[in-house]
Amino acid sequence: MDDTLAKLPRAFSGATVLVLGDVMLDRFVYGAVDRISPEAPVPVIAVERETTMLGGAGNVARNVAALGGRAVLVGVIGDDDAGRALTAMIDREPSLDSALIVDAKRRTTEKTRYISGSHQMLRADREDRGEADGVALLAAFNAHLREVDVVVLSDYAKGVLTPVVLRAAIAAANAAGKPVIVDPKSRDFSRYDGATLIKPNRREAAEATGVTGAGDEVAAEAADAILSTAPNLAAALITRGRAGMTLAVRGEAPVHLPATALEVFDVSGAGDTVAATLALALARGASPLDAARLANLAAGLVVAKLGTDVVTADELVGLAHGEHADPAVDKIADLDGALAIVAGWRARGLKVGFTNGCFDLLHPGHVSLLAQAKAACDRLIVGLNTDASVQRLKGPTRPVQKETGRATVLASLSAVDLVVLFDEQTPLNLIRAFRPDVLVKGADYTVETVVGSDVVLAYGGKVVLAQLKAGQSTTNLIGRMNAPAVGG
């Protein structure tokens, strides 16, 4: 990769992005389902916990901040609890400023997902789709336009980006010399005419143009149709999932960018990361092609993340330099980093499992245990004893492999999603911190003797005893290696 892409993210910290669009509160309600309602043939969810996140245009702004830029968010909320929750979350982001219009007659858009295990049972939307106060929105937009470098219009068809607001915002940005990126929702792409770049996904492009199918030629045809629909639109970037991206710049041949993900764990939030990266790159003078190439790298990073939907400038620099050669590195985290990852998993309703051990000289017994552990959950955390902890448990000659090597080997296994080192004699503190849904140990234990089983069972979790492979142990391996050779 050339130096241009590697240098761009370092300049993000001085860039400011104005995000105008539909701001939402995403709420997740988790619980257990173990019976059907006697009133109707529907499941009964016993609610256990709730989490909330910035959604819609708010998530684009959060991605800008995560990449090192500053975001100014313009949208509308109601005078209600959901609106106040959104404001509080924004206030906690130091690089995110808001100019939200509070409309007492309007409900804050709120999406509530009811989740049991790894299954979404129901989504309930509270929203007003009527037109928001365009005059107030444009006043807030124009008040901040001069201080920013680029504009993102995040359209979720909730009444903020009406045709009138779109035309006025694009015209004002053009007059001020600010690039405009559109993440569209309307099937009528002509309403985004005059923007610098439009970023539909494959489905949105097909619905807007009528061009359907797969492959590079189809994507190029769809991109050309988009530019024909909006004669003053400079470029179209169609995101195509595993097929990568297709960029069409007016007057130039289309360019197909293959997907860069080393491994795909979670695609949630990838579109917002792409929009934020495009905005920051264009703000720093990148060409549409270089901006798209960098956004493609960012998409590859974010879908390889475990339960998170943001990337950092440092990660982009490393990948652009070709330094991100080992995807296993992303699976090794300290406790704080791991807790953030696990929170992301839980926000998506994934069942979290935990097991632990020294894992010195990995053997088939270890692999079998880890495979059984992963089969019992959606995401598996492995607590790994540090070198000092192993030495206290096993004696001064252990471990054979240092903790860095042991962690890397574990992280390279597909069954393992996260590796966290611990220095104590037992993983009890990790178990209390992570609160796994499933705790797994070998069948040489009983449920009662598994460390942390009382904690997990007390909050309704499950303890699984994995079957062992006979004769497989690190101690036996070391003994055989140290035994004198027989014969000549």
From Swiss-Prot:
Pathway: Nucleotide-sugar biosynthesis; ADP-L-glycero-beta-D-manno-heptose biosynthesis; ADP-L-glycero-beta-D-manno-heptose from D-glycero-beta-D-manno-heptose 7-phosphate: step 1/4; Nucleotide-sugar biosynthesis; ADP-L-glycero-beta-D-manno-heptose biosynthesis; ADP-L-glycero-beta-D-manno-heptose from D-glycero-beta-D-manno-heptose 7-phosphate: step 3/4. InterPro entries: Bifunc_HldE, Carboh/pur_kinase_PfkB_CS, Cyt_trans-like, PfkB_dom, RfaE_dom_I, RfaE_dom_II, Ribokinase-like, Rossmann-like_a/b/a_fold. It comes from the Bacteria. The active site is at D272. GO terms for molecular function: ATP binding; heptose 7-phosphate kinase activity; heptose-1-phosphate adenylyltransferase activity; phosphotransferase activity, alcohol group as acceptor. ATP binds at N201, R202, R203, E204. Catalyzes the ADP transfer from ATP to D-glycero-beta-D-manno-heptose 1-phosphate, yielding ADP-D-glycero-beta-D-manno-heptose. This is Bifunctional protein HldE. The gene is hldE.
